[in-house]
């Protein structure tokens, strides 16, 4: 009788929630690149997120991606990838598979999950448990899940967040034979070969304390682990004029903080981190973002400056570092909600040697369909992080069915 | 009739003419320890285009000192987007919005509260509760079945003043007209009133945005009061926990 009543209680508490979408995105590049003659790339993504509340305190979460594209960005194999470490995108991947437990002031999530730290919107120096997928665009990258255990204690305005990530998940870099990898002119005539990656074996951990005051909030955080953006080891063969590039991930330690303070007319947000490394030859540097934002009627504005200061130069100049690439930039974003169904967005980054601006118009049709059209314009010098992608200006159209 | 009741009844009309006491009586009669409903919103633009949204709303605590979580369930693309509102008796509320697609919560700054909430005609400020002591009241007219009361916020608000119409027979709001210094900003009409668990409740709220000539009709379904709820389900962690 007791068991039956417990079971009935459990069943009554169960609830299933899901959301997802199917999206077809077509990107057209007016210019070819030296390593990529394609003008049009078509990508299809099916994303499903679901959660099942087994008891009032225990929820199982799942997130799944299935994708294919016309440009060999996605591996042609019928395998479910659970750790998102592959060089090309996997056709089937787990973004999330976790259990969330909460009791009183403590919430714990164990398994594959998305973890986001930081407060600013343009660049997040402290967001170290959030590797990104830069494979098909350096200026518009999605987030990847990580396998981790996260425990959060919340009491009044204080939150302590502890994260342990036993398996490393790197950011996914552009493929070497495609346009978002720019081979320097000095390497002309050299056959560049992708030699894969050497992933670090240890675990990563971090802690963050967040304080919410009357109108303002700030946090301090610490991270010890690895840089999820790679440096490249080069093995050059003069006989064959071949350079084999291997991705390596230096050790990284971060001391950071962020704050959001509403002023009379604007909200001031800041985020900063100092990165050190025990890996010989690895760069040590600070990244910071100062951002002002405001909403005026249907408009939202965010703009600011992302800066960096290098305290130890990298011995290896071959790095893929969009976080530092977007530093020393004035960055801005404006959004307009035209009505309940239509939105307009403008985003830009301006550096001394390069600039990027993107316009997007988006419209919802009925309850499920959304179309988003956009134009991105990239200009600058080959020596600049943004400017090197000057042949990658594009127009895009995404049609999404949400369910 | 007992001797005790006679002076009380004699006092009643004078008592009721005090606008602050009227508002207090409204709050008292609508008091509940918690509330839950499922809302269907029809946003009707100037060109009569209709966008339908749905949300669930849960509140714990008494008026002006409560916490609420509002979470979209439709359309599919905004499913899971949530808003946590922590109302304070002595100041404006704290609000955070959670967007599951990007895994981030965003604090809604006080100066941004006049912005429309997710394409509806409600502003973020319209979704908060402010205690009776955060306003000054003036009784403008006794209009037979209703009182017309002017309220002026003592603290920062997008509205310079508002007019309330309150029914005399059951102490419920019928209409609010909210003005900025430049003129009428928004009207809110409370319709289809019925008693639910002894509390007079509007089943439909209609908001009209004067500048945009846009209307949002919110219909309340599965509305219940005084359900068992826990404080722990009205925190930032709780906002992030759901899908």
Task: State the predicted function of each range.
Chain B
Residues 60-66, 139-146, 196-197:
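Short, ordered beta-strand-loop transition motifs
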Residues 21-24, 40, 53-56, 133-139, ...:
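Short structured motifs
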Residues 18-100:
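N-terminal mature ectodomain segment of secretory-pathway/periplasmic proteins
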Residues 16, 24, 73, 84, ...:
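Gly/Pro-enriched, hydrophobic low-complexity segments
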Residues 89, 101, 111-112, 136:
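Short, flexible active-site-adjacent loop segments at beta-strand->alpha-helix junctions, enriched
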Residues 1-8:
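Sec-dependent signal peptide recognition
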Residues 242-243:
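Short, solvent-exposed mixed-charge patches
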Residues 8-16:
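Hydrophobic h-region of N-terminal signal peptides that target proteins for export
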């Amino acid at each position: 009788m007791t068991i039956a009543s417990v079971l009935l209680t459990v069943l009554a508490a169960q609830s299933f929630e899901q959301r997802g979408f199917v999206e077809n995105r077509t990107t057209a590049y007016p210019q070819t690149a030296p390593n990529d003659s394609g003008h049009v790339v078509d990508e299809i993504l099916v994303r499903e997120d679901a959660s099942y509340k087994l008891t009032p305190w225990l929820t199982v979460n799942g997130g799944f991606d299935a994708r294919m594209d016309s440009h060999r960005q996605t591996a042609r194999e019928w395998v479910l990838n659970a750790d998102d470490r592959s060089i090309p995108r996997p056709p089937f991947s787990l973004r999330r598979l976790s259990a969330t437990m909460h009791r009183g002031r403590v919430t714990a999530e164990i398994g594959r999950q998305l973890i986001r730290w930081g407060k600013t919107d343009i660049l997040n120096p402290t967001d170290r448990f959030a590797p990104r997928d830069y494979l098909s665009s350096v200026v518009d990258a999605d987030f990847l899940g990580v396998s981790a255990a996260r425990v959060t204690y919340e009491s009044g305005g204080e939150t302590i967040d502890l994260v342990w990530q036993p398996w490393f998940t790197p950011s996914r870099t552009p493929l070497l034979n495609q346009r978002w990898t720019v081979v320097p002119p000095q390497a002309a005539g050299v056959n560049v070969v992708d030699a894969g990656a050497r992933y670090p074996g240890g675990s990563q951990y971090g802690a963050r304390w967040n304080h919410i005051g009357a109108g303002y909030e700030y946090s301090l955080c610490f991270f010890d682990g690895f840089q999820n953006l790679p440096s490249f080891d080069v093995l050059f063969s003069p006989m064959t004029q071949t350079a084999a590039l291997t991705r390596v991930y230096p050790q990284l330690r971060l001391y950071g903080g962020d704050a959001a303070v509403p002023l009379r007319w604007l909200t001031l947000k800041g985020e900063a981190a100092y990165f050190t490394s025990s890996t010989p030859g690895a760069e040590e540097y600070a990244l910071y973002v100062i951002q002002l934002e405001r909403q005026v009627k249907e408009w939202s504005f965010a703009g600011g400056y992302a800066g960096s200061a290098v305290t130890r130069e990298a011995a290896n100049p071959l790095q893929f570092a969009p976080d530092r690439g977007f530093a020393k930039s004035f960055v801005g974003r404006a959004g307009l909600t035209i009505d309940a169904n239509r939105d307009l967005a403008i985003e830009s980054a301006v550096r001394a040697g390069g600039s990027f601006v993107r316009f997007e118009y988006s419209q919802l049709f009925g309850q499920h369909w959304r179309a988003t059209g956009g134009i991105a314009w990239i200009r600058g010098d080959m020596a600049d992080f943004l400017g090197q992608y000057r042949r990658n200006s594009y127009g895009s159209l995404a049609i999404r069915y949400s369910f | 009739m007992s001797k005790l009741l006679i002076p009380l009844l004699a006092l009643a009309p004078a008592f009721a003419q005090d606008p602050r006491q009227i508002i207090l009586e409204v709050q008292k009669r609508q008091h509940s320890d918690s509330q839950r409903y499922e809302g269907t919103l029809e946003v009707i633009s100037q060109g009569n285009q209709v966008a339908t949204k749905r949300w669930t709303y849960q509140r714990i605590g008494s008026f002006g000192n409560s916490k609420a979580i509002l979470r979209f369930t439709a359309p599919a693309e905004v499913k899971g987007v949530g808003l946590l509102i922590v109302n304070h008796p002595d100041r404006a509320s704290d609000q955070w919005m959670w967007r599951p697609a990007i895994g981030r919560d965003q604090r809604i700054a006080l100066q941004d509260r006049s912005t429309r909430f997710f394409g509806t005609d409600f502003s973020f400020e319209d979704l908060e509760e402010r205690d009776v002591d955060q306003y000054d009241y003036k009784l403008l007219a006794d209009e037979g079945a209703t009182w017309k009361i002017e309220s002026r916020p003592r603290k920062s608000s997008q509205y310079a003043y508002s007019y309330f119409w309150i029914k005399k027979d059951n102490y419920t709001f019928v209409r609010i007209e909210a003005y900025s210094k430049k003129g009428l900003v928004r009207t809110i009409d409370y319709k289809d009133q019925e008693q639910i668990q002894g509390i007079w409740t509007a089943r439909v709220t209609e908001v009209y945005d004067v500048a945009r000539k846009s209307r949002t009709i919110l219909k309340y379904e599965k509305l219940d009061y005084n359900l068992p709820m826990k404080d722990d389900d009205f925190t930032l962690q709780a906002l992030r926990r759901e899908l």
